[in-house]
């Protein structure tokens, strides 16, 4: 998988892609990966795809709540953000000095060593 836990990503597709500022300019939403669901190929991104969960009261004296929380989005809808250029970019893998490294395809800079 091209995304790792803690990576800063941009939303590149879907209803959560843009937010408009006060001037009407569209800004791509970004967030940090909180959790990865490998089998479903989904990720949980901080502050993205907020849904409301209705919680029923557990006891008679308790009240029910409406809780805001993040919902998972598909892995294909996110792209890693290049830290130097601050743009979403694809990620590749290559072998350098007998180590597998992850790198940005646009700039060619290495993200991390995997071994």
From Swiss-Prot:
Q: Does the keyword Transit peptide apply?
A: no
The record's Pfam families line, in alphabetical order, gives: ribosomal_L24
Q: Does the keyword Mitochondrion apply?
A: no
Q: Which GO terms describe its biological process?
A: translation
The family database entries (CDD domains) matched by this protein are listed as:
KOW_RPL26
Q: Which domain of life is it from?
A: Bacteria
Q: Name one GO molecular function term.
A: rRNA binding
Q: Give the SUPFAM superfamilies listed for this entry.
A: Translation proteins SH3-like domain (SSF50104)
Q: Which PANTHER family match?
A: MITOCHONDRIAL RIBOSOMAL PROTEIN L24
Family, similarity comment: Belongs to the universal ribosomal protein uL24 family.
**What's its job?**
One of two assembly initiator proteins, it binds directly to the 5'-end of the 23S rRNA, where it nucleates assembly of the 50S subunit.
NCBIfam families xrefs: rplX_bact
Protein known as: Large ribosomal subunit protein uL24
- Source species: Phytoplasma mali (strain AT)
From the broadest rank down, the organism's phylogenetic lineage runs: Bacteria, Bacillati, Mycoplasmatota, Mollicutes, Acholeplasmatales
